[in-house]
């Protein structure tokens, strides 16, 4: 309320009236939604557009199932976790067609978890349904369960790959599909879980799910290249936030990257080595050799001039 403190009882009564009405609506939606199991709502997703050029949300659910299977095997998930991930992938988007989420979109995921538990799904499945939206914003919780991690990565890489494949990429301040946030989410989940996961293979798996079903504007190779660069920029920010110097990070990422956890280990290794007194000596030697190499003219070595066996072995090795 703006203004004076006069007539607060009237203001309170008005607010309570509005709040009671909204709570009554929410209770009605909740009871209506529970009249059928969450799984029975999935076919209705065939009528919900995911993205105008990428099919329906039901199509996305099918892709999530394929990606969850792929990731589960790559990450060596046990059969039980893989079972939970498969089921959660099928149910992940079902709450989008519930009365509650239609009226309160910000409750997606929350209601999926609640309805899954209330209609007999395993708690691990319900948790994964909720966790697949995590992290929702910077500093948010990460998925705590392996099925949740699998489903979260699957959901986000599907969004990113699909958008890139039809030519939709963030530019400047424009990022209508929140692809930067989703890429950061993938990075944090993989790094936190220390997963041995190749971005190249992950993007290929996601791309293959679209192939032959929608019209893609870019080739797999181009999409992999663009997404690798996109993720490289996200990793630069993450490593910088962890206290690594920009030149250390740039040096490691300069040749490109594919494996998230391996890249972090290399950044840490280089940062540690830079504290070693031998690093400066090595850098001096390399700089001199590099400068000489820039000035050198091209030539072909003549193996007939080699005299020592060690020279011949070195020549063969090179």
Task: Report residues per predicted region.
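Amphipathic alpha-helical "coupling" segments that flank catalytic cores
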Residues: 1-318
């Amino acid at each position: 309320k703006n203004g004076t403190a006069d007539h607060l009882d009237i203001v309170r009564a008005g607010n309570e009236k509005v709040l009671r009405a909204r709570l009554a609506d929410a209770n009605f939606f909740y009871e209506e939604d529970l009249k059928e199991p969450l799984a029975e709502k999935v076919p209705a997703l065939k009528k919900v557009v995911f993205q105008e050029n990428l099919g329906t949300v039901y199509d996305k659910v099918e892709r999530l199932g394929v990606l969850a299977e792929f990731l589960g095997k790559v990450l060596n998930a046990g059969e039980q976790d893989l079972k939970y991930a498969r089921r959660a992938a099928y149910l992940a988007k079902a709450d989008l067609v519930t009365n509650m989420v239609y009226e309160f979109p910000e409750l997606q995921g929350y209601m999926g978890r609640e309805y899954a538990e209330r209609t007999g799904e395993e708690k691990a499945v319900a948790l994964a349904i909720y966790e697949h939206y995590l992290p929702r914003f910077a500093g948010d919780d990460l998925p705590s369960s392996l099925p949740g991690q699998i489903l979260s990565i699957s959901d986000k890489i599907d969004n990113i790959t699909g958008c890139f494949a039809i030519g939709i990429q963030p530019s400047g301040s424009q990022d209508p599909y929140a692809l930067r946030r989703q890429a950061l989410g993938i990075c944090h989940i993989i790094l936190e879980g220390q997963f041995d996961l190749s971005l190249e293979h992950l993007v290929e798996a996601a791309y293959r799910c679209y192939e032959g079903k929608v019209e893609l504007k870019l080739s797999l190779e181009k999409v992999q290249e663009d997404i690798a660069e996109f993720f490289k920029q996200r990793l630069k920010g993450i490593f910088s936030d962890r206290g690594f110097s920009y030149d250390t990070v740039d040096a490691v990422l300069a040749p490109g990257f594919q494996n998230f956890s391996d890249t972090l280990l290399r950044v840490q290794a280089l940062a540690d080595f830079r504290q070693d007194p031998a690093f400066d000596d090595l850098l001096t030697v390399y700089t001199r050799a590099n400068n000489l190499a820039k000035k050198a003219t091209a030539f072909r070595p003549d193996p007939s001039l080699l005299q020592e066996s060690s020279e011949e072995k070195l020549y063969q090795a090179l």
